[in-house]
A protein has these predicted regions:
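An acidic/histidine-cluster motif and surrounding catalytic segment
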Residues: 2-134, 138-421
Length: 421
């Protein structure tokens, strides 16, 4: 029976990714990353077309056909299957539907809020175990599926109970430790999760953002019990050199660049995270968010800031069932896991195509083609799908190596696959 066109496209995308990975991952500097991708610790379901989630939703205003075209191609080249959620115009969100009388919410924020509520509503309505929500300006690395396998292993330190029988994950043991950091290679193996390959006791995985901070410990005066545990992923060939670890070209470098060796990615609980290029929710997380911000809370700011406050326990309530006590460390607290640098990031397209319909990071300085930036770019992403899209679609070379370009020009062998600094 002949393969369907979509099956052929997914197969080709997988072969290209596999070829690139093996070509550039043969040095000892990335051996631990390679081991986690190829060993029994890896979750094979993450290699599917929805990254191990039940669905991938992408929010897109119907008028932004340019963005829909770009995401469609990026997903096809990455072997991903996406489902569209129509964006909402602010004019279509009257005061009477805003929760808690949120009449001071700005116009652009209204439409964004409702679109995200519609995505959460779909997840709850269809009783999905988990789903990934993307915004239509998101970009990612060609090696995304391998990245997600490594992330899943690290995330279980916060989302999966240990074998000890305590019913709590590893992170629960580190509330009083000052900034504990554990290498991903030294993590104990928890029982296999039953609900998602990322663990069973999480609410939100914040995978794409424009900034986050490490959680403070109880010793640092943190009044709410949240684990400061950090899981370090060393020698990650997909992490940019330290000087490029910033949310936009005019920003200061992230503290991560000074705190860890080059090419280290760190997974930890969310703290002060902003922007919602990509986040996953579990069924329990979607229900909590839809209730809290679709019905109960008065909103005065953008959805990403609201979501950040929720993960930071700003909306903590003693109401039974409002959160759980696993990864977060206290009864009634949401479990939000993030990663820095992020795995998804905002793409600034050539010719101003990356301009947001709401607002954008960079204080208005990111205007491609207006003397500020000479060409399109994506913070934090080395082998950008969007920046390599033309070459991957047109196939300008019989050698796959010649198709992929690191946007920071770190070189093919030394910088791309082997983590040049």
């Amino acid at each position: 029976m002949p393969l369907r066109p979509r099956s052929v496209a997914v197969l080709i995308a997988f072969i290209i990714t596999l070829f690139l990975w093996f070509k550039y991952s043969r040095s000892s500097s990335v051996s631990s990353w390679h081991y986690l991708v190829t060993s029994s610790k890896a979750s094979p379901e993450i290699l599917n077309a929805t990254l191990g989630f039940q669905s991938i939703f992408t929010i897109n205003l119907p008028s932004r056909t340019d963005r829909r075209d770009a995401v469609t191609l990026a997903a096809a080249l990455s072997g991903l299957d996406i489902t569209w959620i129509d964006g909402v115009a602010s004019a279509d969100v009257p005061d009477k539907v805003l929760p808690g009388g949120s009449t001071t919410m700005k116009g652009g924020n209204r439409g964004s809020w409702r679109a995200h509520m519609n995505a959460l509503q779909r997840i709850v309505e269809q009783n999905m175990t988990s789903a990934l929500i993307l915004e239509d300006d998101a970009d990612w690395d060609i090696r995304l599926k391998s990245q997600m396998q490594v992330f899943a292993h690290a995330a279980k330190a916060f989302t999966q109970p240990l074998r000890s029988g305590s019913g709590r994950p590893l992170s629960s043991k580190y509330h009083d430790h000052p900034a504990p950091s554990i290498s991903i290679t030294k993590l104990p193996s928890p029982p296999s999760p039953k609900l998602t390959p990322y663990g069973d006791t999480w609410d939100l995985l914040w995978l794409g953002h424009c900034g986050t901070s490490f959680a403070a410990s109880a010793q640092d005066g943190n009044s709410i019990p949240i684990s400061p545990l950090r899981v370090a992923i060393p020698s990650d060939p997909t992490v940019p050199p330290p000087r490029h670890l910033k949310p936009h070209p005019f920003a200061l470098t992230d503290p991560l660049a000074e705190l860890y060796p080059p090419h280290t990615r760190v997974v930890h609980l969310s703290n002060g995270t902003t922007c919602t290029q990509a986040y996953a929710v579990s069924q329990q997380g979607a229900r909590k968010l839809l209730y809290r911000f679709g019905l109960a809370e008065r909103l005065t700011k953008g959805w990403d800031l609201v979501l950040g406050d929720w993960c930071d326990r700003g909306y903590h309530s003693s109401v039974a069932g409002d959160g759980d006590s696993n990864g977060g460390g206290g009864a009634g607290l949401p479990v939000c896991v993030t990663v820095q640098p992020p795995l998804f990031s905002h793409h600034y397209g050539a010719g101003g195509g990356g301009k947001s319909d709401i607002s954008a990071p960079g204080g208005g300085f990111l205007r491609v083609g207006e003397g500020r930036l000479e060409k399109g770019m994506t913070p934090y992403v080395r082998w950008s799908v969007r920046l390599n899209m033309g070459k991957l679609v047109e196939g300008g070379s019989s050698d796959v190596e010649g198709l992929v370009v690191d946007q920071w020009g770190e070189g093919k062998e030394g910088g791309l696959g082997r983590g040049g600094s």
